[in-house]
Swiss-Prot record:
It comes from the Archaea. GO terms for biological process: translation. PANTHER family: 60S RIBOSOMAL PROTEIN L3-RELATED, LARGE RIBOSOMAL SUBUNIT PROTEIN UL3. This is Large ribosomal subunit protein uL3.
Amino acid sequence: MGMKKNRPRRGSLAFSPRKRAKKLVPKIRSWPADKKVGLQAFPVYKAGTTHALLIENNPKSPNSSQEVFTPVTVLETPDVTVAGIRLYEKTTKGLKALTEVWAEQLDSDLGRKLTLAKKEEKKTVDALDAVLEKATEVRAIVHTNPKTTGIPKKKPEVVEIRIGGSSVAERLAYAKEILGKTLAISDVFEAGEIIDTLAITKGKGFQGSVKRWGIKVQFGKHQRKGVGRHTGSIGPWRPRRVMWTVPLPGQMGFHQRTEYNKRILKLGSEGAEITPKGGFLNYGAVKNGYVVVKGTVQGPAKRLVVLRGSVRAAEDKFGLPEIAYISTESKQGN
C-alpha cells in the first residue's frame, strides 16, 4: 500500500452555512477599545476602483523611495444624520436596551425606512439622564443621505454606531451634542488611519462545487460521461446521511465579510477631483466628499460599506505613504 499524499480539504468551513445575508446593511458585532470621544464607525457607498502611485516609505524594501503601482478604492462619503441615541446596560444575557431618544426634527425620507413616532410621544433628553447609572454603552442611531449621491434612491440606511470615550457620562455628553446634527467623514476618521471595512460581498448566485469550493476537476471517464465537475464522493454508506462538510453546489456570494487593517490614503470634500473621465462604472460621478482606501473593498458599486476603527491594528511602523499620482483616466475601456 503506497504512502497517502497530503491532501487538505477543499474550501473553508469557517463561513458555513454559505447563505445569503439577510440585509444589505452589515451587522457590527465588535468595536475597538478606544478612549477617544466620537463615533467609532461611518457608513459610506462604494464608487469604484482605480490605481495610484505611492512612494514606498519602507527603508528596507527593494523599492524604497520609488513609485509603486497600488490599487485603491474610492468610497463616496455623504454626511450622515444623527437621528437618535440609545443606551444599553450589561446583563448576564448580553446587552439590553434601556431607553432611546430621537431628534425633534427628522428627515421626511426616514419615514420610508422606519415608522416615526408622533411628536407628543417622543421622549426628551432627560430620559437618558434617568438611567445613566445603569448604562454601560452609548450608541448613536444614524442614517445615510443617499439622495445627495448619484444612487437612484431616497430611502436611507439606518446604522447603530457605538460612541467611544473613557466614561459613560463623557460619551452621553457627546451624544447630546450631535443629536439631530449631520456629521462628515472628517469628524470620525483622518488620513493615514487604519480601519476595518464591513460589507455584503458581490452575489454570484447558484454555483457548482468547483467554483464554490475549489474541488478538483475530474478527467478520463468522468469527462466522457459529462460529470467531470461533480463531487466524486459525497460520503460513506454509514451514517446514512450527507454530512454538512461535503462540498456541494449552492449559493455563492452575497455574504457579510469583514476585512481588517485597511489604510485611509486620502480624504477629500470635492468629488469632482477624484471622479474619472466618464464616471465610475455602474456608479457615475462622485458628488460629495470621498475617501481613498488602499487596496480593494468587498462588494459591488453602490454597495453600503461601513468603515470601523480597527479592532486588531498592528504597530504602524512607517505611517502614511506619499501619494505621487491617482489615476482619473476613463474606466470605460476606451
